[in-house]
């Protein structure tokens, strides 16, 4: 989810835009434990339980020599495990349903799939003492939580790609299908106070068509928007488990005339991932992204357009329960000398456009985010006070939409919400658009910075 810059971040919904950078997303002990930095230092290891089975298959006698074999050994009924592409093990008896409704924790009872592991080019800089320090950056639940959230994202988005995202579908049906899947696979419907904080949506599903680049979602009682075969659709949604948010996005186009646009942005995102890592500077990452993206052009209906990196929206770091931290990764050459550090989590995303490559706030509302620095102690409007209690009890710092409020049964909230926004207690986010008639695309992955390499936690077979 793209992030606005601090200069534009606390603006009112339709405040004037400046030429400053805007981040792309708004900020408002188990058997599944994993190590913080050791996975890449020592490699991901499998389960020793299969060693005896492998030995038997190779004709090696694994029985105690002094035991006389009197009966033919019965064939073991032990369920075999298969290795996933990432090298971890999973029981393969259970399969996901369509629509997805089987808990990911049921499908992977002992260990969640690991993301794409990419060692750094030079790992000699990491001493044993540094590795021990880095392993303490993350608690025991950090990797299991992140890997569970990533697997939920993969399964839900692949279902959406196959079954939901089709010409003629309403964007509301796509959004609800994605969000129902996330809640079902996480096991938390978020209907009781506090349940939303355990697992669920990391932010509202963004479904942005054509010149709308980011921050659009269906709202209640608005006219249905129908997906057309000539549209370019950006799908951006987040999944969290215990506040560990996986932020990943992709673009769908049914007409191959947009292929170069999608390829440019996908390759630019992968370039950003390639250059990301411990001690990498934001300026270097941005320059590399821009060079790759703007090497492409796309021909649409006989006219050739250069693909432009959108310059006032950025990638960002992710903090617990906060989709946006304090660091930004522009998609263009810049002077940002901030460095990435061990233990950090980043959303590496890029947006490309056939238009100006600059976004403005549009009319409408995408969602809301609680400003934790502002108290509601001086509120006078009773509806605003009541609404703020609902927000704090059910969403906290996680961005939410009007659909989420109505799902909780909240009614007649618009006046109270306006009061909260006017007092700076809640921030309202608008859709971000390029010029009409242009087309925009987005691809995004979440990465974890281990001491020995990076883990592209949201990587899948699709992108």
Curated annotation (Swiss-Prot):
Its EC number is 3.4.11.18. The keyword Protease applies. One of its GO terms (biological process) is proteolysis. Signal peptide: none annotated. GO terms for molecular function: initiator methionyl aminopeptidase activity; metal ion binding; metalloaminopeptidase activity. Residues 69-85 have a biased composition (Basic residues). A divalent metal cation 2 binds at residues 247, 316, 349, 444. Its cofactor is Co(2+); Zn(2+); Mn(2+); Fe(2+). Substrate binds at residues 215, 324. PANTHER family: METHIONINE AMINOPEPTIDASE 2, METHIONINE AMINOPEPTIDASE 2-2. This is Methionine aminopeptidase 2-2.
